UniProtKB/Swiss-Prot annotation:
GO terms for molecular function: copper ion binding. It is found in: Cytoplasm. Belongs to the CutC family. This is PF03932 family protein CutC. One of its GO terms (cellular component) is cytoplasm. The lineage of its organism: Bacteria, Pseudomonadati, Pseudomonadota, Gammaproteobacteria, Vibrionales. Keywords: Cytoplasm. Gene3D superfamilies: Copper homeostasis (CutC) domain (3.20.20.380). PANTHER family: COPPER HOMEOSTASIS PROTEIN CUTC (PTHR12598), COPPER HOMEOSTASIS PROTEIN CUTC HOMOLOG (PTHR12598:SF0).
Amino acid sequence: MSIQIEVCIDNLESLHNAITGGADRIELCSSLALGGLTPSFGFMKKAAEISPIPVYAMIRPRQGDFLYDNDDIAAMISDIQAAKLAGLQGVVFGVLKANGDIDMPLSARLMKIANDNDLGVTFHRAIDQCSNYKKAIENIAELGCERILTSGLAANAYDGINVLADMVKLANGRFDILAGAGVTAENAKEIIEKTGVKEVHLSGKSTRPSKMKLILDGVKMGAGDLDDFIVPVTDAKKIDAVKQRIK
């Protein structure tokens, strides 16, 4: 059985590293530290030019929950169209109602735009905040998504093994279950063997020091606990280590 490795990235340096490490598919985001937000059009376009493997754009207009208003949905529709215009292969989204159910009317609107633009669709970890994952899986099957990205309702995929295994059974081949959150070379094989998933998702995150010669510590571009002169990047060796472990 061939296991697919999806790597989530939020910069072009990480895209190159993920490809070098052996990724099979890219989830393109901005702000991975916030769980991943919609990437810019320029980022999408350049990623499409660079990548020899499929690239799916995160469609998430803001951090926080997955309860969206009409303005959010309008922006998401435009972003899906932008992903097609940029030359990407798919998109990643999830929309919930206030009670934790999947918002089927709004999700169907987004699916139609994706389908009209021949884009594949991954339903993301919004399912991990659903009120009933079994009902959610049937909803997602009705929508026609290719896969669900999930940690099995847990803080990480390893802790969610039992639910992930149940999700694979419930999906019953209608779509793939993509196990993500905390996947590493140390646990990927066990997650796969105990759940039956055919795809895993990770960032392979690492950091590198800034190449700036002038380092000014007194001015922050964002949160005070973040070092602006440390750059988060995907480590190609971490991706390759997972690939070698699950062969």
